[in-house]
């Protein structure tokens, strides 16, 4: 009797079902793919391919008002590059939160996250959605593995139609074309099975001739299952009908005492490793629309009017003539302005040659063009003041700065949306650290004083076994020039007002309670600590003075030998009616000193 082996949970039948499901998902987002590809053409100033032909003229002007909008918004996003900080929800978690706040910037820097942030903001502004991928890459860090934060092209991502949150999709697919030779080197069992896959993803219109005949689509299939009240994330990597990896097929644990991937899933956090950053959200889709979708109609109209105006200028600057067939004029010599003589046959009549008059355009057309340009500026919030320009009559520096700060509220709102997505990315990074960091790692961090410090990060020692609930606070690492200037001026004003004087700490703390600015809590802690140190110092000095003089504390006060009074009793300050210290006149003071010296008895 033959023994029948159990078939793996993920086989050929499951791959065929997944491929059919992927085709349905692709059909559901076909409209989004077309819009993203068209928007990319507008970004590259190739929108004339999407404008109907206007007559037989070959003149096609291209203005970059829409491009300027994207450039300005991207600059605002880079000024607000995020920096994470972990805040504990319980007193016992303060040490762990402080440690993760030091480790996270190192991981972001190792992933060159600033470039990922920049690239995704380009995509967000153009297409309306950018996607971050957070994975565990076993090949990093010399084979020890590390967290990988990558930019994911929305064209290569497929989700369930009708959902608004990627995490709520029943399945999620990521497709990427890979060279056949590379695949065979990594998976020799693919030899003879590659070439011309049954699924093709949407592609951009490249300048270069991109040949994909020797490439095959590698499909990453993510799906969730509910087991025991928790969501488990499973993962399948396949090409065609060949399974390369499947978590449900991994029934053996890699380490002794650990659970197999078939029970544990790919990641312990149970979430899809993709996070969408949407610019302008839409109902029924996790994607959105961008500035190209808002402004491309106005950009078309601007270029059409520019084309007509330039064509009119060219026609007016290039004289054309109505010529009778029997006028006897040598056309070649007449058209050549370098020929001093033009030969004719017979007599010349005025009706034989007449210039075509081109009527100049009215100023109304130029006003319409200017209004369309202003329409793009107003619609996108990219006014002149955002780029350093000022309105007529505004000359005060403070007024200009206030206008620039107020005009940036749209960018600040969009950046806050990106910060929310960034919190999800950081939370996923922390979960991967807990799951996969199994050995100490040496990291270079930034110390409290800005100097380089070196940290030996041991997850088994430094992190708790159970996940800790932390709040992720995101702040801009690079403040704008206006913000830096305002913070510096405020610090100088606080210094001049005596806020940092320990003797005035109680008054300064009272004033801080009514103020709101960045770093207020840190300043409050510093002033409280300085005031406490001063009180302890005064008490210690008083006790020492009593011990040295041998007098009782009350007698020391009466004789004026107070510990913090040097040179005898302290004279009170002379103040005006509102409490300000009166400034003394140097000449008058010298006169008083001479008079006192003369009148003192010898």
Describe the role of every protein-language-model region.
Residues 237, 273-274:
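Well-ordered beta-strand positions
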């Amino acid at each position: 009797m033959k023994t029948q082996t159990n078939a793996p949970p993920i086989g050929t039948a499951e791959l065929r079902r997944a491929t059919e499901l992927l085709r349905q998902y692709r059909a559901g987002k076909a409209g989004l793919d077309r819009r993203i590809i068209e928007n990319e053409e507008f970004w590259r100033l190739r929108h004339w391919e999407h404008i109907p032909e206007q007559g037989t003229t070959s003149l096609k002007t291209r203005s970059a008002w829409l491009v300027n909008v994207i450039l300005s918004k991207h600059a605002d996003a880079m000024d607000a590059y995020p920096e994470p900080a972990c805040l504990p929800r319980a007193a016992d978690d303060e040490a762990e939160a402080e440690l993760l706040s030091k480790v996270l910037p190192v991981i972001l820097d190792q992933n060159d996250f600033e470039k990922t942030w920049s690239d995704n903001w380009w995509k967000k502004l153009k297409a309306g959605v950018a996607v971050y991928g957070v994975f565990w890459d076993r090949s990093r860090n010399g084979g020890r593995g590390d967290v990988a934060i990558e930019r994911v092209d929305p064209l290569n991502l497929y989700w369930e139609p009708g959902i608004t949150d990627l995490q709520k999709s029943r399945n999620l697919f990521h497709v990427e074309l890979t060279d056949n030779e590379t695949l065979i080197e990594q998976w020799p069992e693919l030899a003879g099975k590659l070439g011309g896959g049954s699924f093709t993803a949407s592609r951009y219109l490249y300048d270069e001739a991109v040949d994909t005949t020797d490439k095959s689509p590698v499909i990453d299939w993510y799906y969730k299952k509910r087991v025991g009240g928790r969501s488990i994330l499973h993962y399948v990597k396949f090409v065609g009908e060949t399974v390369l990896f499947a978590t449900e097929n991994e029934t053996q644990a890699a380490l002794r005492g650990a659970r197999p991937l078939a029970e544990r899933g790919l990641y312990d956090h149970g979430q899809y490793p993709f996070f969408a950053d949407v610019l302008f959200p839409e109902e029924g889709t996790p994607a959105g629309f961008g500035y190209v979708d808002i402004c491309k109609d106005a950009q078309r109209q601007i270029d059409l009017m520019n084309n007509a105006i330039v064509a009119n200028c060219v026609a007016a600057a290039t004289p054309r003539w109505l010529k009778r067939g029997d006028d006897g004029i040598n056309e070649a010599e007449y058209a050549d302005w370098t020929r001093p003589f033009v030969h004719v046959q017979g007599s010349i009549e005025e009706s034989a040659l007449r210039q075509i008059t081109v009527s100049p355009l009215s100023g109304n057309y130029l006003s319409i063009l200017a209004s369309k340009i202003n329409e793009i500026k107003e619609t996108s919030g990219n006014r002149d003041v955002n780029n350093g320009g000022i309105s007529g009559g505004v000359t005060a520096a403070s007024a200009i700065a206030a206008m620039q700060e107020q005009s940036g509220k749209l960018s600040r709102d969009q950046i806050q949306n990106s910060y929310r997505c960034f919190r999800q990315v950081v939370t996923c990074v922390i979960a991967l650290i807990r799951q996969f960091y199994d050995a100490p790692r040496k990291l270079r961090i930034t110390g409290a004083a800005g100097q380089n410090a070196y940290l030996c990060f041991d997850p088994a020692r430094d992190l708790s076994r159970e996940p800790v609930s932390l709040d992720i606070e995101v702040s801009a690492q690079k403040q704008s020039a206006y913000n830096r200037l305002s913070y510096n001026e405020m610090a100088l004003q606080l210094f001049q007002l005596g806020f940092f004087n320990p003797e005035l700490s109680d008054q300064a703390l009272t004033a801080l309670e009514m103020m709101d600015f960045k770093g207020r809590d840190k300043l409050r802690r510093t002033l409280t600590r300085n005031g406490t140190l001063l009180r302890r110092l005064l008490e210690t000095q008083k006790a020492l003075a009593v011990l040295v003089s041998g007098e009782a504390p009350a007698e020391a006060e009466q004789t004026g030998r107070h510990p913090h009074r040097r040179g005898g009793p302290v004279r009170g300050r002379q103040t005006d009616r509102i409490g300000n210290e009166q400034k003394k006149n140097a000449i008058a003071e010298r006169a008083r000193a001479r008079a006192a010296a003369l009148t003192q008895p010898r």
